[in-house]
Amino acid sequence: MAFLKKSLLLVLFLGLVSLSICEEEKRENEDEEEQEDDEQSEMKRGMWSKIKEAGKAAAKAAAKAAGKAALDVVSGAIGEQ
């Protein structure tokens, strides 16, 4: 009977150690995945900020060109009178 108790305790102990190791590896994998997700979202944020800046620059250039064209039209109309 004592032999069975010792064997059972040994099996339980080894099972707990194995479970602990598995949980630790699982946590490490989750941390790695989270870090990869953070890097990807950071890259996306950087890409979107560049697109946003390019859009602002294009809008500014278009507005400037439209303003200049309108000024030329008004100047031409005033010059004709």
Curated annotation (Swiss-Prot):
Acidic residues bias spans: 30-40
Prosegment residue ranges: 23-43, 79-81
GO biological process: one example: defense response to bacterium
Record flagged with keyword Signal: yes
Keyword Secreted among record annotations: yes
Compartments, record wording: Secreted
One Gene Ontology cellular component annotation held by this UniProt entry: extracellular region
Family note: Belongs to the frog skin active peptide (FSAP) family. Dermaseptin subfamily.
Name this protein carries in UniProt: Adenoregulin-related peptide
Species annotation: Agalychnis callidryas
